[in-house]
């Protein structure tokens, strides 16, 4: 379940340094969060879709690793990202 390009550009513009900044941890966390939310909505309707559930767990783990990295390298940006995305400080 990929994000459409308009939504992706909007997220990159909000969290990136410029419109081509797709690799910074903040942008990656925001994109992963959006994908996680979409898959979560899908799983609420399709409870027996186990392959999507495994993909969701993989994305959550990847986001957790990126959040841990961002917290260690740039704590202020980390706090800004988790408040903007309504995430908990669990890492």
Curated annotation (Swiss-Prot):
Secretion signal span: none
Entry-linked PROSITE patterns: RIBOSOMAL_S15
Gene Ontology biological process terms in this record: translation
Gene Ontology CC annotations of this record: cytosolic small ribosomal subunit
Pfam families per the UniProt record, alphabetical: Ribosomal_S15
Record GO terms (molecular function): rRNA binding; structural constituent of ribosome
Keyword entries, A-Z: Ribonucleoprotein, Ribosomal protein, RNA-binding, rRNA-binding
Family recorded in the similarity comment: Belongs to the universal ribosomal protein uS15 family.
Quaternary structure and partners: Part of the 30S ribosomal subunit. Forms a bridge to the 50S subunit in the 70S ribosome, contacting the 23S rRNA.
Function, in words: One of the primary rRNA binding proteins, it binds directly to 16S rRNA where it helps nucleate assembly of the platform of the 30S subunit by binding and bridging several RNA helices of the 16S rRNA.
Protein name per its UniProtKB record: Small ribosomal subunit protein uS15
Organism: Nautilia profundicola (strain ATCC BAA-1463 / DSM 18972 / AmH)
């Amino acid at each position: 379940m990929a994000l459409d390009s308009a939504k992706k550009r909007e997220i990159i513009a909000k969290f990136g340094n410029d419109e081509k900044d797709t690799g910074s941890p903040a942008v990656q966390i925001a994109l992963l969060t959006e994908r996680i939310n979409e898959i979560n909505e899908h799983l609420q309707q399709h409870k027996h879709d186990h392959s999507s559930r495994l993909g969701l767990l993989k994305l959550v783990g990847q986001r957790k690793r990126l959040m841990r990295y961002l917290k260690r390298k740039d704590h202020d940006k980390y706090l800004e990202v988790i408040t903007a995305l309504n995430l908990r400080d669990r890492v």
